[in-house]
UniProtKB/Swiss-Prot annotation:
Native organism: Escherichia coli O139:H28 (strain E24377A / ETEC)
InterPro entries: SprT-like_domain, SprT_Zn_ribbon, Uncharacterised_SprT
Subcellular location: Cytoplasm
Gene3D superfamilies: Metalloproteases ('zincins'), catalytic domain
Active site: 79
Principal location class: cytoplasm
Record-annotated SprT-like domain positions: 20-163
Short name of one Pfam family: SprT-like
PROSITE patterns membership: ZINC_PROTEASE
Keyword Zinc: yes
Protein name: Protein SprT
Single Gene Ontology MF annotation: zinc ion binding
An individual GO BP term: response to stress
Key word Metal-binding present: yes
Length: 165
C-alpha cells in the first residue's frame, strides 16, 4: 500500500471503514468476498477508482487529506460497491441499478455518482478559449492538441469553434 504522506490515523480510518462495509456486505449477501487491495495513487479530480480485474481501490490522497471525514464516509463505500457489484453480478453499468442497490440496500450509503469536494488544489492549469457566447477553460492536454493541430473544439451551445484568447 503506497502511503503518499498520509497520516497513519487517516489510513487506519480508511481501512476501518472499508472492512466495516465489506463485513456488512458479506453478511447481507451471504458471501465471503475478499478484502480488496487499497492504494493511494489516484490523481487529478477523481476521488477514487475501482479497478475490477485487479480487485483494487485507488484513492486520491490529496482529496482524502483535505476532506477526510466525508471522503471516508462516501468515497470508500462508493468504490467498494463497484467491486462488490462486479463480483456479485458480473460486468454491468458502472452506476446502474445494481450499483445503486448495493450502495443503498446493502451498504446503507446514499448512492451518489459524483463528489462535491473543492478541487482547486488538484485542478491543473487551464487555458482560456472563447466562442461567440462565452469563455471556456481547456485543459493542458486539450490546449496542446489544438496547438499541434490535432483537434478542434466547438462550443456545445453556439457550435462555434473555440479560439485561444
Amino acid at each position: 500500500m503506497k502511503t503518499s504522506r498520509l497520516p497513519i490515523a487517516i489510513q487506519q480510518a480508511v481501512m476501518r471503514r472499508l472492512r466495516e462495509k465489506l463485513t456488512q456486505a458479506n453478511l447481507k449477501l451471504g458471501r465471503n468476498y475478499p478484502e480488496p487491495k487499497l492504494s493511494y495513487t489516484q490523481r487529478g479530480t477523481s476521488a477514487g477508482t475501482a479497478w475490477l480485474e485487479s480487485y483494487e481501490i485507488r484513492l486520491n490522497p490529496v482529496l482524502l487529506l483535505e476532506n477526510s471525514e466525508a471522503f471516508i464516509e462516501e468515497v470508500v463505500p462508493h468504490e467498494l460497491a463497484h467491486l462488490l457489484v462486479w463480483k456479485h453480478f458480473g460486468r454491468v453499468a458502472p452506476h446502474g441499478k445494481e450499483w445503486k442497490w448495493m450502495m443503498e440496500s446493502v451498504l446503507g450509503v446514499p448512492a451518489r455518482r459524483t463528489h462535491q469536494f473543492e478541487l482547486q488544489s488538484v485542478r491543473r492549469n487551464t487555458f482560456p478559449y472563447r466562442c461567440k457566447c462565452q469563455e471556456h477553460q481547456l485543459t493542458v492536454r486539450r490546449h496542446n492538441r489544438v496547438v499541434r493541430g490535432e483537434a478542434v473544439y466547438r462550443c456545445v451551445h453556439c457550435g462555434e469553434q473555440l479560439v485561444a484568447k
